[in-house]
């Protein structure tokens, strides 16, 4: 089965291809099929993921899988949340993962409450009008470090310390990260849903 990934993020594609490999599905980036980015006008991960999945399905004629993910920092009332990808631009930096990390660490200077969660919401639709989308949510809670640690992964991986492991996601090998990450948890739920309802 071929499924279009409603994302152009190469990190998400690599992670999700590995995580969904047991199903034998072929995951293809929407950009490779000539599809642009969907609008993400909503304030929740699930609404944005659903909008992205429906958009990709409508423009490709294929079932679609979308991921909307972000960092929710307790000290900031859950922000940046759905605005995670553009977080740095709020503070005068160019858009980008390294600048997001930089902006986060700058904004957290002098803040002792460093609890945060990475959240991944996966939504799969068989068609643009699918009345029963599959929805899976993964969440991992950790502490924001005071400086980046590790060189693996992407996004906020270098600054989210996992208390149970004593390491950031960026300090872990990919297979360990995938087993413990927010996206890995959501993907495991999605695997079960796809097996039960689609395959």
From Swiss-Prot:
Homodimer. It comes from the Bacteria. This is dITP/XTP pyrophosphatase. GO terms for biological process: nucleotide metabolic process; purine nucleoside triphosphate catabolic process. The active site is at 68 (proton acceptor). Pyrophosphatase that catalyzes the hydrolysis of nucleoside triphosphates to their monophosphate derivatives, with a high preference for the non-canonical purine nucleotides XTP (xanthosine triphosphate), dITP (deoxyinosine triphosphate) and ITP. Seems to function as a house-cleaning enzyme that removes non-canonical purine nucleotides from the nucleotide pool, thus preventing their incorporation into DNA/RNA and avoiding chromosomal lesions. Binds 1 Mg(2+) ion per subunit. Belongs to the HAM1 NTPase family. It holds the Pfam family Ham1p_like. One of its GO terms (molecular function) is dITP diphosphatase activity. InterPro entries: dITP/XTP_pyrophosphatase, ITPase-like_fam, RdgB/HAM1. Its cofactor is Mg(2+). It catalyses: XTP + H2O = XMP + diphosphate + H(+); dITP + H2O = dIMP + diphosphate + H(+); ITP + H2O = IMP + diphosphate + H(+). GO terms for cellular component: cytosol.
């Amino acid at each position: 089965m071929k499924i279009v990934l409603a994302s152009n993020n190469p990190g998400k594609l690599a992670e999700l291809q590995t995580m969904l490999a047991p199903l034998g599905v072929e995951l293809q980036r929407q950009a490779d099929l000539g599809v642009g980015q969907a609008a993400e006008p909503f304030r929740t991960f699930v609404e944005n993921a659903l909008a992205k999945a429906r958009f990709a399905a409508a423009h490709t004629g294929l079932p679609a899988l979308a991921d909307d993910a972000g960092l929710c920092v307790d000290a900031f009332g859950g922000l940046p949340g759905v605005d995670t990808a553009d977080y740095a631009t709020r503070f005068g930096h160019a858009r980008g993962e390294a600048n997001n990390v930089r902006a986060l660490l700058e904004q957290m200077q002098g803040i002792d409450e460093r609890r945060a969660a990475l959240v991944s919401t996966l939504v799969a639709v068989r068609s643009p009008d699918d009345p029963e989308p599959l929805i899976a949510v993964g969440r991992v809670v950790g502490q924001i470090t005071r400086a980046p640690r590790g060189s693996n992964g992407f996004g906020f991986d270098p600054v989210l310390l996992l208390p149970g492991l004593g390491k950031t996601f960026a300090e872990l090998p990919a297979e360990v990260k995938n087993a413990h990450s927010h996206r890995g948890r959501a993907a495991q739920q999605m695997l079960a849903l796809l097996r039960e309802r689609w395959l």
